[in-house]
Amino acid sequence: MIRAVLLGLRAVVFDREAARRLYASGYYGKPLGIPKPRGSNFDAPLELGLLETLHLLERGMLEVYDEEGHRVSVEEVRRRAERFIPKFELLYKVYRDLRDRGYVVRSGLKYGSDFAVYERGPGLEHAPYLVHVMRVDEEIDPLEIVRAGRLSHSVRKAFILALTGPRDTPIRYLLLKWSKP
């Protein structure tokens, strides 16, 4: 079992061999000090965000401990994520769904979206999709759609709205594309 230590809003896998295995198993996390890793041949600890940590913990791929060496439960990680990540429930629901469908999900912050989504993985391709997560009943300003569409078009990525709600609300994915009249 791979062991991680929860440090604030991140979990770190210090065992470098375990870090390489975990990264190779689905491009989870970021090797510390390596901005753009090419594959899993790196020699560094692996930093995981709370969404990744919770996902791996729920799937039995990771054990999480605090700094004193006490085991951290799924519920504790979830509570921490709910406290510090705005719209956590919606984001995690979409993150988990995309991962379960076989996609590699990374932060889309540098593109102004919630997620950048890969079919194969970073370093193998550019992310073909940007995903913005919203509540299904949330209003959106049409100008925001135009902005997001223009940005995604300028970086050659498809823009997807992921619309969902609390627990049992299904996720609806809307792919927005530019069309020429």
Curated annotation (Swiss-Prot):
Gene Ontology terms: biological process: tRNA-type intron splice site recognition and cleavage
SUBUNIT field: Homotetramer; although the tetramer contains four active sites, only two participate in the cleavage. Therefore, it should be considered as a dimer of dimers.
Keyword Amino-acid biosynthesis applies: no
InterPro entries in the cross-refs: tRNA_endonuc-like_dom_sf, tRNA_intron_Endo_cat-like_sf, tRNA_intron_Endonuc_cat-like, tRNA_intron_Endonuc_N, tRNA_intron_Endonuc_N_sf, tRNA_splic, tRNA_splic_arch_short
The protein's name in its UniProt record: tRNA-splicing endonuclease
Superkingdom classification of source: Archaea
CDD domains reported for this sequence: tRNA-intron_lyase_C
PANTHER family xref list: TRNA-SPLICING ENDONUCLEASE SUBUNIT SEN34, TRNA-SPLICING ENDONUCLEASE SUBUNIT SEN34-RELATED
Family: Belongs to the tRNA-intron endonuclease family. Archaeal short subfamily.
GO MF assignments: lyase activity; nucleic acid binding; tRNA-intron endonuclease activity
Pfam families documented for this protein: tRNA_int_endo, tRNA_int_endo_N
